[in-house]
Amino acid sequence: MTTLLNPYFGEFGGMYVPQILMPALRQLEEAFVSAQKDPEFQAQFNDLLKNYAGRPTALTKCQNITAGTNTTLYLKREDLLHGGAHKTNQVLGQALLAKRMGKTEIIAETGAGQHGVASALASALLGLKCRIYMGAKDVERQSPNVFRMHLMGAEVIPVHSGSATLKDACNEALRDWSGSYETAHYMLGTAAGPHPYPTIVREFQRMIGEETKAQILEREGRLPDAVIACVGGGSNAIGMFADFINETDVGLIGVEPGGHGIETGEHGAPLKHGRVGIYFGMKAPMMQTEDGQIEESYSISAGLDFPSVGPQHAYLNSTGRADYVSITDDEALEAFKTLCLHEGIIPALESSHALAHALKMMRENPEKEQLLVVNLSGRGDKDIFTVHDILKARGEI
């Protein structure tokens, strides 16, 4: 199929979907390309970002956790966005695209529930019906977000098949869309999946990095030495990285979930510890068995519990432009506690992975003068019960 935009990032990406979905993807690509050139669409999108979502978000300098080091650490505060995470940015763009295509329904998948909440709020705002697929395990561990979705009129459909987590919700959402694409838009929640989704999601998240660049230049008079973001599917990270990719003096660091430790096999780090395959409509690194079956990923954070990764991250990793590391559950939990105790900010467990790596960089070389920015992709309200149960089991509370 001929596409308007390049469907690949190097060897990664593509459109590996049933033939029945090709017209839907073609229509979506055409709508996106025309919308990007339409001043009216851009004005409407920017108005929603500013006056509904609350952009630009703050860039907060950490006051206390850098004590005793020469590190200056800033947090890009996507946790302050309406909806509680960066997810709100791109769903507003996709919901406007759905209206532009004449769709009346939204289909979405969600892991931590943040994309589900974002899809529900955008659908409510723009008068679209919304149904959300969510792994049954995630429905249990993210009950506050499930109720938020219900409050905003969305139907939440628990998925019991497979591992009953995000990968299974993705499969069910795609299955639904293949039978309903004439009236429904599939609002994919991350910068992964078949073309044109990785490109659409990046472009609807790139204001994170654009704002960060302007804010850090105003505050510090220079660009950061590195920007750091957690990577599940990779949308918050690609949103932060996009405007810095050509700034070769700025390090790009993506942080995958190390779970119980890479050596245990219980993690979600396919970029560094997976093999390239075809899954979820794209060619990308993924966690798979010797015979090519998709393995279950694991993370304390439901939003990072994904067995593959967006194709642009795979490309940035293969070219060496970005570095990808992993952080374990325990390290993320310590970073979560540190930010709460010393800065008065409760981060999402997803974002805590990125923060943990920044703290590691700072502590391993306290004498080094470095300017770091962590993308604090979401707030941790949804995670307080998970953290409470772990700390209680350890006898810490």
From Swiss-Prot:
User: Which Pfam families is this protein grouped with?
Assistant: PALP
Q: In which pathway does it act?
A: Amino-acid biosynthesis; L-tryptophan biosynthesis; L-tryptophan from chorismate: step 5/5
- As recorded in UniProt, its EC number(s) are 4.2.1.20
GO cellular-component terms in the record?
cytoplasm
Quaternary structure (record): Tetramer of two alpha and two beta chains.
Keyword match Transmembrane helix: no
Organism's domain of life? Bacteria
**Function in brief:** The beta subunit is responsible for the synthesis of L-tryptophan from indole and L-serine.
This protein is called what? Tryptophan synthase beta chain
Which molecular-function annotations from GO does this UniProt entry contain? tryptophan synthase activity
Does the record bear Lyase in its keywords?
yes
Print the keywords alphabetically. Amino-acid biosynthesis, Aromatic amino acid biosynthesis, Lyase, Pyridoxal phosphate, Tryptophan biosynthesis
**Modified sites of kind N6-(pyridoxal phosphate)lysine:** 87
Required co-factors = pyridoxal 5'-phosphate
